[in-house]
Curated annotation (Swiss-Prot):
The keyword Chaperone applies. CDD domains: RecA-like_ClpX. It comes from Methylocella silvestris (strain DSM 15510 / CIP 108128 / LMG 27833 / NCIMB 13906 / BL2). It holds the Pfam family zf-C4_ClpX. Belongs to the ClpX chaperone family. Residues 3-56 form the ClpX-type ZB domain. The gene is clpX. Zn(2+) binds at C15, C18, C37, C40. ATP-dependent specificity component of the Clp protease. It directs the protease to specific substrates. Can perform chaperone functions in the absence of ClpP. This is ATP-dependent Clp protease ATP-binding subunit ClpX. ATP binds at P119, T120, G121, S122, G123, K124, T125, L126. GO terms for cellular component: HslUV protease complex. NCBIfam families: clpX, PRK05342.1.
C-alpha cells in the first residue's frame, strides 16, 4: 500500500482507474501491474452495496431466507399464503441441506420433495417457476401424461433429467442442484386400489420408474435425447440433490377426503350423508397419505413426497388482483401491447369484476383469465393498427358482457366516439 507523500515527478504513481496521482488521494493500493486509489475502492463498494439492496437478503449460508422467498412469491403469485409458507421453508431447508452436506459428515439430512395439490388454475406451476427464478438454479417442467415405462412408446423418465441438463447448458454440476416440476402427476394414478394384473405402462409403471430418480440415483442420460443405444455415450447425473416438485389438480380427491371415516352402507338402513358444501381447496387441506393411496398413488411414491402443500380455490377478489397486481399481470401485459401502438388501454373497475366472475363461472381459475381477455380485446387489436390518432381505449363492464363496443378516444378531435372496434 503506497501512502501519500512528496517525491519526484518521475517516481509519481497514478491510479490506473481514475488517473489521479498519489498526491491527490489519501491512499494508493498497489497491485502486480496496476494501482487503485481509495476513492475508486469506495466507488466500487457503493456499486456493490446498491446491487445488494436490489437482490434478496441472504441468510448466513448464502441462501434466501424463508421470509424473503415468500416475499418474492407474493410479487408474482396472488393468494395461497399457506402454500407459499410451506414451499418457502421446504426450499430453504433443501438448499441448506446441500450446504450442510459439504461441511459435515456426522448427520445425513434426507431430501424432502414436494407435492402441490390444488384446483386447476390456482397457481401450482407459477409457484414452481417463480421459485426457480428466485434461487437462480436450473429449472425444468415435465408433463407426467407423456411419460411411459422404458421400452414403450412415449418419454422415458430420464428425459426429465435431460431437460434439466439442457436448462443448465449441460453443466452437470449445476444440474445436480436444480429443480424439476412434474405437472399433471394425478394423471399417472393407477385405475383401482388393487395392484393391477395387467401392465399399466403410463400409470403405475411411471410411478415405479420415477421412484429411483426422485429418491436419488445416478441416471445415465443420452446427450441427444431419444432412446438409448448400446454404442451411445451417456452423461452420468446424480439426482440425490435435485428437488422434485409434483403438482396436480387431483379431481375427485375431495370426495375421498370427505367420506374418510364415515363408512359406507346400502339398503333401507343406510345413513344419508349430507352434501359437503365446503370449497375444494378447503377440503384439500385435510388430505392424508391414505387418501392419496385410495386415489391411486402407490405407497412408495407417496413416501417420497413428504411435504404436501395444498392450494385454495381463487375467489373473485383474488382473480381481480391477479389481473392487475403482479409484476407480470395480464392487464399490464395488454397495456404494454397497446403502448406499442401509442394507445393507452384502461379498464373500468366494474369491468374487472365482470372478468373475474366469468372466470369463476368457467371453473378454470386464473388460467381462464387470458382467454377471456383475448375475447374482449380481439376486435380492438385487429383494427387498432389501421386506425390513426386513437389516444385511449376504455373497456367498461358492458364491453366484457358483449353488450357494447370499447370506447375510443381520439387525440385529433379530442372527443369521444363509440366507433366500432
Amino acid at each position: 500500500m503506497t501512502k501519500v507523500g512528496g517525491g519526484d515527478a518521475k517516481n509519481t504513481l497514478y491510479c490506473s482507474f481514475c488517473g489521479k496521482s498519489q498526491h491527490e488521494v489519501r491512499k494508493l493500493i498497489a497491485g502486480p501491474t496496476v494501482f487503485i486509489c481509495d476513492e475508486c475502492v469506495e466507488l466500487c463498494m457503493d456499486i456493490i452495496r446498491e446491487e445488494n439492496k436490489s437482490s434478496l437478503v441472504k441468510s448466513r449460508d448464502g441462501i434466501p431466507t424463508p421470509k424473503e422467498i415468500c416475499k418474492v412469491l407474493d410479487d408474482y403469485v396472488i393468494g395461497q399464503p399457506q402454500a407459499k409458507r410451506v414451499l418457502s421453508v421446504a426450499v430453504h431447508n433443501h438448499y441448506k441441506r446441500l450446504n450442510h452436506a459439504t461441511k459435515h459428515n456426522d448427520v445425513e439430512l434426507a431430501k424432502s420433495n414436494i407435492l402441490l395439490i390444488g384446483p386447476t388454475g390456482s397457481g401450482k406451476t407459477l409457484l414452481a417457476q417463480t421459485l426457480a427464478r428466485i434461487l437462480d438454479v436450473p429449472f425444468t417442467m415435465a408433463d407426467a401424461t407423456t411419460l411411459t415405462e422404458a421400452g414403450y412408446v412415449g418419454e422415458d423418465v430420464e428425459n426429465i433429467i435431460l431437460k434439466l441438463l439442457q436448462a443448465s447448458d449441460y453443466n452437470v454440476e449445476r444440474a445436480q442442484r436444480g429443480i424439476v416440476y412434474i405437472d399433471e402427476i394425478d394423471k399417472i394414478s393407477r385405475k383401482s386400489d388393487n395392484p393391477s394384473i395387467t401392465r399399466d405402462v403410463s400409470g403405475e409403471g411411471v410411478q415405479q420408474a420415477l421412484l429411483k430418480i426422485m429418491e436419488g440415483t445416478v441416471a445415465s442420460v443420452p446427450p441427444q435425447g431419444g432412446r438409448k443405444h448400446p454404442q451411445q455415450e451417456f452423461l452420468q447425473v446424480d439426482t440425490t440433490n435435485i428437488l422434485f416438485i409434483c403438482g396436480g389438480a387431483f379431481a375427485g380427491l375431495e370426495k375421498i377426503i370427505s367420506t374418510r371415516g364415515k363408512g359406507t352402507s346400502i339398503g333401507f338402513g343406510a345413513t344419508v350423508q349430507a352434501p359437503d358444501d365446503r370449497r375444494t381447496g378447503e377440503i384439500f387441506r385435510k388430505v392424508e397419505p391414505e387418501d392419496l393411496l385410495k386415489f391411486g398413488l402407490i405407497p412408495e411414491f407417496v413416501g417420497r413426497l413428504p411435504v404436501i402443500a395444498t392450494l385454495e380455490d381463487l375467489d373473485e377478489e383474488a382473480l381481480k388482483k391477479i389481473l392487475t397486481e403482479p409484476k407480470n399481470a395480464l392487464v399490464k401485459q395488454y397495456q404494454r401491447l397497446f403502448e406499442m401502438e401509442n394507445t393507452e388501454l384502461s379498464f373500468q373497475d366494474e369491468a374487472l369484476n365482470v372478468v373475474a366472475k366469468k372466470a369463476i363461472e368457467r371453473r378454470t381459475g386464473a388460467r381462464g383469465l387470458r382467454s377471456i381477455m383475448e375475447g374482449i380485446l380481439l376486435d380492438t387489436m385487429f383494427d387498432l393498427p389501421g386506425l390513426d390518432s386513437v389516444e385511449q381505449v376504455v373497456i367498461g363492464p358492458d364491453v366484457v358482457e358483449g353488450k357494447s363496443r370499447p370506447l375510443y378516444i381520439y387525440a385529433e378531435r379530442n372527443e369521444k366516439s363509440g366507433t366500432s372496434a
